[in-house]
């Protein structure tokens, strides 16, 4: 598997995180490293109940939904911006960048011949 450090722009701060994925780029775990989101609302992003919503999600399913959802990520009530910052800006974009970087692994860069 792989771990990528990523971030998203939350309601009142940037949210720094680590995203752990398996070899197929399925999320295994997200850890919040730093944030300054609103106490009692946005700071819920670091709680287990929210972080567990990411387990076994593919890039395509890293989308925030308001209300119940089985395959996407349910937003924290009252903290949709923070939820999107973690899910879409941080996790999805981080995994996407990792996948793109690794797919180019081993390819040689050819420049103009002199």
Per-range role (PLM):
Residues 1-114:
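Flexible, solvent-exposed loop/hinge segments and secondary-structure transition points
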């Amino acid at each position: 598997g792989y771990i990528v450090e990523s971030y998203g722009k939350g309601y009142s701060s940037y949210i720094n995180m680590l995203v752990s994925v398996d070899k197929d780029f399925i999320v295994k775990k997200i850890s919040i490293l730093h944030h300054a989101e609103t106490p009692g609302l946005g700071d819920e992003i670091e709680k287990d109940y929210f972080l567990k919503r990411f387990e076994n999600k593919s890039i395509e399913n890293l989308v925030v939904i308001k209300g119940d959802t089985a395959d996407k990520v349910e937003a924290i009530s009252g903290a949709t911006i923070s939820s999107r910052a973690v899910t879409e800006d941080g996790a999805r974009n981080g995994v996407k960048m990792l996948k793109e970087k690794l797919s180019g692994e081993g390819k040689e860069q050819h420049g103009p011949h002199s």
